[in-house]
């Protein structure tokens, strides 16, 4: 459905935009408790890692939306077989990178 494509494009695009903001060292898109104990000199590195994770999640959602739209038009299951693992893998990898950064620089999630 077209609404699914639009939703995935919006959610994925927002995640990519927020990740890009974080990668510049601007942590304003995060809750304060996610970076409360991050040292000032580590904020840039922390932002890069969290931003990379967020961009990875956003890109996987965006690509998944496009692949599911193609599936709806072609009814070829190959798009599901490619899109679903890509979505799950992107979310898991992106979350892992973000959590790694939080544990490394913030000494925990909270």
Residue ranges of each PLM-predicted region?
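Membrane-water interface of transmembrane alpha-helices
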Residues: 16-33, 101
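Alpha-helical transmembrane segments
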Residues: 2-18, 86-90
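Alpha-helical transmembrane segments and their immediate juxtamembrane interface regions
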Residues: 77-110
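Cytosolic juxtamembrane segments of membrane proteins
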Residues: 31-38, 104-110
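Select subsegments of transmembrane alpha-helices in polytopic membrane proteins
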Residues: 47-60
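Helix-coil boundary and interhelical linker segments in multi-pass alpha-helical membrane proteins
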Residues: 1-6, 70-78
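Transmembrane alpha-helical segments of integral membrane proteins
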Residues: 61-72
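Short membrane-interface loop/juxtamembrane segments of multi-pass integral membrane proteins
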Residues: 36-50
């Amino acid at each position: 459905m077209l609404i699914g494509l639009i939703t995935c494009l919006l959610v994925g695009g927002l995640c990519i935009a927020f990740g890009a903001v974080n990668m510049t060292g601007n942590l304003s898109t995060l809750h304060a408790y996610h970076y409360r104990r991050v040292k000032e000199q580590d904020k840039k590195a922390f932002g890069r890692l969290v931003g990379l994770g967020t961009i990875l999640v956003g890109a996987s959602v965006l690509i998944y939306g496009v692949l599911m739209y193609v599936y709806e038009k072609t009814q070829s299951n190959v798009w599901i077989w490619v899109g679903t693992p890509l979505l799950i893998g992107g979310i898991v990898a992106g979350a892992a990178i973000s959590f790694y950064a939080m544990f490394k620089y913030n000494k925990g999630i909270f």
